[in-house]
Amino acid sequence: MTLDISKYPHLALANTPDELRLLPVESLPEVCDELRTYLLNSVSQSSGHFASGLGAVELTVALHHVYNTPFDHLIWDVGHQAYPHKILTGRRDQMSTIRQKDGIHPFPWRGESEYDVLSVGHSSTSISAGLGMAIAANKEGLGRKVVSVIGDGAITAGMAFEAMNHAGDVHSDMLVILNDNEMSISENVGALNNHLARLLSGSLYTTIREGGKKVLAGAPPIKELVKRAEEHIKGMVVPGTMFEELGFNYIGPVDGHDVTELVKTLKNMRNLKGPQFLHIMTKKGKGYAPAEADPINYHAVPKFDLSQNPLPKAANAKPTFSKIFGDWLCDMAAEDEKLMAITPAMREGSGMVRFSKEYPSQYFDVAIAEQHAVTLASGMAIGGYNPIVAIYSTFLQRGYDQLIHDVAIMELPVMFAIDRGGLVGADGQTHQGAFDLSFMRCIPNIVIMAPSDENECRQMLYTGHKHQGPSAVRYPRGNGLGAEIQKEMTALEIGKGIIRRQGEKIAILNFGTMLEYALEAAEKLNATVADMRFVKPLDEELILELAANHDVLVTVEENAIAGGAGSGVIEFMMKSKCLKPVLNIGLPDRFVEQGTQQELHTALEIDAAGIEKKIRDYIA
């Protein structure tokens, strides 16, 4: 989207932070208005993360106006709110390509811009990384400043508090900004706190505060009394006592949509010593009424018409695997009052909205706390209940030790419903579910299932729920294949696959929803196709049978080849001294970039044509 100067006269003067810093503070409200309008028009035409960026416009402008980026390090947690940052850092005309194949990255990305000092995508990493950069900057001695911006959801994660606890201990110079969009600010409270922020971050207060510390250093009881008095006074008007206890100087909350006041406060705080904490209040979706009213559904959007509401929906779309899971969850809860469902802040994405409303006493959203989610399930299982952890593949990585230490070692009946297994598409490297089969397969005591369609997914969920030990059902993002759903639920025989097509010479061992591709390729090759169903335990009897009756075995999976299901097949064959050629088809040994799922399947040659080509090349 090329900038029309007549519509954006102020924004046209700020294509980079250097240009923005040349503008007078008085013009920044107009810059913000135009930036918000540009963001609205751009994302509505390209798709992408929407509501978060709209709420961070004034903060972004103020930060780049006050701080000398990229010399000063500005870190965005997760990165959903970083679209305005991308627009102001030389990528304005490329915004129409965001999240698209070969386009600009959906999150801050080091390889894309010198202004993106940390590649992100998962939450709650900004304070730890910022503290590391602050320590390095202190040793460097060049006066480099470090700012970490984190949201009210991300700051609930344990990693964020671990970082703040350490920051208070080492006392490095850094600023943490909490972008709190949980509520709107009333005019009076906003004005009062803006005034307090200027007062508490100003040089007079800071000088008195630091001078008092030195004077009272020799009288610890009095020093402690004064410290408590200061915290008490702050606590009467601002909710910052907890952050003060962690060693931060807390300022706020202030109006995050008053760019002039933000600039004043940030200028005051820029040269303060030690860890600083600025709490700002913003409105997610600011400037677009439908997004303000429904920020969850407007978190990420398809292409849409700004003049129309609600967002467009695909006509007659097949149900998603997430919906299949959500419907199964409700059906199962009707039979099992001991079923407990846990999600780490992924209610909508995991298809759990209906369940949360129909079975609220059995539903637990633990916020962004994957480690806690897994061990919470462990405790529930010990207590005699039947917990299910609904989690994205990419986020299960964050609870890996708990999966091993708190579930698998004790062989507890916890089932993991792993959504977004395989390639998720537009969110790129940080979100592809490429590794779960590999990192789970090496864990003893766990049953791992990979359904080939939505009905098999439903039956596997039932199988895992009834299994008296750890289990995982791994399914992809997006719509199902149109398979007929059997209402009746039947437990599958653990570790048994089935033949889906009988051929000769070549046997394709399929794991998961690549089955459709495998069958299409098999028609061209006259190959046998087995739906293996179980990654662990493998159907060893079926593998030996296929090896005995075919010249070549081919494994197909939407997971990293390294350590994946295909690796398991080869390991078993070597152990059994079954010396037959085996071709592994799956994801390559690299982080897979963004694009639609279909684009990536084609590019990586794991669609039907790619599978056929790889097999023909192998047997040539």
Curated annotation (Swiss-Prot):
NCBIfam families recorded: dxs (TIGR00204), PRK05444.2-2 (NF003933)
UniProt protein name: 1-deoxy-D-xylulose-5-phosphate synthase
Domain of life: Bacteria
Gene it is expressed from: dxs
SMART domains for the chain: Transket_pyr
Pfam families linked to this entry: DXP_synthase_N, Transket_pyr, Transketolase_C
GO CC terms, sorted: cytosol
TM region(s), chain numbering: none
Species in which this protein is naturally found: Photobacterium profundum (strain SS9)
